[in-house]
Design a protein with these regions (language model features):
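Alpha-helical transmembrane segments and their immediate juxtamembrane cytosolic regions
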Residues: 1-232
């Protein structure tokens, strides 16, 4: 890649339309897949059974979560509120908002189910309320980034940190699966139970690369030429 395309000063500081689309697409498909899984008449198997399910699972899975997290990393750089303290507060609000969402989408249905059937499943209720999803991860990722920014870690080093975290997380995930309540806490950081979908150690690599990409993108003098060199 030609260094002539990279300036030593920031040029592209306004939000980029292509990256806004990159954020919008995952949100759309995450909404679609969650509505489909929760409101489908048929039983949803882990393995897709139909062509439609294959398409939905791919577009809302491997092609969505990493793209959203990468775009989030770019957004951190382009945000006017990325000072460490502000970033940490935003992350904390998102993290707590994840549990508020759990309560909102599960609490009413759990209460109705208990009232109608007279049966109460404490383990299922605990899972529904404490399950970690992408909103919790986003909050943790922002708080993690705020700590790294606070100690003046450079973007390339942040990527290195994320690689180390992923290696550690993968090793920890090889330990026997937890069944205790502690798994709901540990699951925020590495995959140790079904309750944690996006543990920080194994997924932070995507926003980390987004942070690096956004830092470079702000200094690109010719975006079209640069994207061409990237094969995009």
């Amino acid at each position: 890649m030609s260094n002539s395309l990279i300036s030593d000063r920031k040029i592209n500081c306004s939000r980029q339309a292509e990256l806004e689309l990159l954020k919008a697409y995952p949100i759309l498909f995450m909404i679609i897949i969650h509505v489909y899984e929760n409101l489908s008449v048929g039983r949803i198997d882990p393995t897709p059974r139909t062509y439609l399910e294959h398409v939905l699972q791919f577009l809302a899975g491997p092609a969505t979560a990493p793209a959203y997290m990468f775009a989030m990393g770019v957004g951190i750089i382009y945000s006017g509120n990325n000072a460490p303290k502000l970033l940490f507060r935003r992350g904390l609000r998102l993290f707590l908002g994840g549990y508020a969402l759990n309560a909102a989408r599960s609490g009413i249905l759990t209460a109705l189910g208990t009232a109608l059937t007279g049966r109460f499943d404490p383990e299922l209720t605990k899972y529904l309320f404490l399950n970690m999803d992408i909103l919790h991860f986003a909050g943790l990722a922002l708080m993690m980034s705020s700590l790294l920014f606070g100690i003046k870690i450079k973007p390339l080093t942040i990527v290195g940190v994320s690689l180390i975290l992923q290696l550690i997380g993968r090793r920890l995930a090889m330990l026997p699966e937890m069944t205790s309540d502690f798994s709901y806490i540990a699951g925020h950081f590495y995959k140790c139970s079904p309750a944690g979908c996006f543990p920080l150690m194994q997924w932070y690599i995507y926003p980390a690369f987004g942070i690096l990409f956004g830092t470079v993108l702000q200094r690109v003098s010719d975006l079209k030429a640069w994207y061409r060199q990237l094969g995009l």
